[in-house]
A protein has these predicted regions:
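Regulatory cytosolic signal-relay segments
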Residues: 32-101, 153, 192
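DG-centered beta-turn motif at the end of beta-strands
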Residues: 119, 190, 235-238, 279
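Alpha-helical transmembrane segments and their helix-membrane boundary motifs
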Residues: 1-53
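Catalytic core of PPM/PP2C metal-dependent serine/threonine phosphatase domains
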Residues: 68-71, 125-205, 219, 275, ...
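Primarily the active-site beta-strand->alpha-helix module of PP2C/PPM metal-dependent phosphatases
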Residues: 30-40, 96-172, 245-250
Length: 292
């Protein structure tokens, strides 16, 4: 039982005691009448103070959560610089006011863009704080972001050194060359991004374990080509968990294959509210057919 609950129980007993004394006293017993009224009024005052304190605490907590939500929203890209020859759609829905999903899109020199997506273990405020930490680490390394292995290595070692063992993150970092459609990526235990083109589906499988588990972990880079008309989907497991049922990835692949203008809405329409138990992040990148 919490401290506030114990206080309310004690106060309720005081009020009941005052009422009992009042009910049992002799009709003309003024001392007992005053005692009963004193106990009763004391109980009411204590209850009022306890409820007021609880209300203030709850109001402050709600205000803190709103402020944290607003801060986290500023950490996620609200507007992305135009990607020449590409279209990008983003969808983010935290389970609670704040969440442990992190995503970023960072423009780099020479027609390149860095995509980062991470899913922190846990939910709520603790996960959101670690997600903000990862965001700061990625942004601080934007000058060397073309070296994805260094990015993954640095963040992994940082988490191993400064976070508890139960706190870790799956992540994917991907570097896109706009002109060629070449995408180099490191996947640290994240749900495999899905590349769809000409009716074929390719999963960008994991190239290393999640970040923050083992210090000095070795990761690998792999490269794929996004051809004109191709679509690449980054997502956290909140998407597949939120779809539920058998083979949710297969249903996602079918939705990606829809017309480019409706692909994102087709994906999000698969979500079932009764399975919504996690943060959901989706990035859908499309290479336009007219740019080669």
């Amino acid at each position: 039982m919490s401290r506030s609950s114990r206080m309310l129980t004690t106060v309720a007993l005081l009020i009941q005691l005052g009422g009992l004394v009042f009910a049992l006293m002799e009709p003309k017993s003024k001392p007992l009448m005053f005692l009963a009224l004193f106990i009763y009024m004391t109980g009411l005052l204590l209850m009022n103070g306890t409820l007021t304190s609880e209300f203030v605490r709850k109001t402050q907590l709600e205000a803190d959560q709103i402020a944290a939500k607003q801060i986290q929203q500023t950490l996620h890209p609200q507007k992305v610089e135009e990607l020449s020859g590409y279209e990008l759609e983003m969808f983010y829905k935290p389970l609670r006011g704040v969440g442990g999903d992190y995503f970023d899109v960072i423009a780099l020199p020479n027609g390149r863009t860095l995509f980062a997506l991470a899913d922190v273990s846990g939910k709520g405020m603790p996960a959101a704080l670690l997600a903000a930490n990862i965001q700061a680490l990625v942004r601080s390394m934007s000058n060397v972001a073309s070296d994805l292995l260094s990015v993954a290595h640095h963040i992994n070692n940082h988490l191993c050194c400064y976070t508890p063992p139960e706190r870790f993150a799956t992540a994917v970092f991907a570097l896109l060359c706009h002109e060629t459609g070449e995408l180099t990526y490191v996947n640290a235990g994240q749900n495999p991004p899905i590349l769809c083109s000409s009716g074929r589906t390719t999963f960008l499988e994991s190239t290393g374990i999640p970040l923050g588990l083992v210090r000095e972990t070795q990761f690998q880079c792999r490269t794929v080509i996004i051809p004109p008309g191709g679509k690449l989907l980054f997502f956290t497991d909140g998407l597949t968990d939120g779809i539920g049922g058998l083979e949710p990835e297969g249903r996602v692949c079918e939705a990606i294959g829809n017309d480019s203008a409706t692909a994102m809405s087709s994906i999000t329409s698969l979500l079932n509210p009764k399975f919504n138990e996690d943060d959901i992040t989706i990035l859908l990148l499309k290479r336009l057919s007219g740019f080669i």
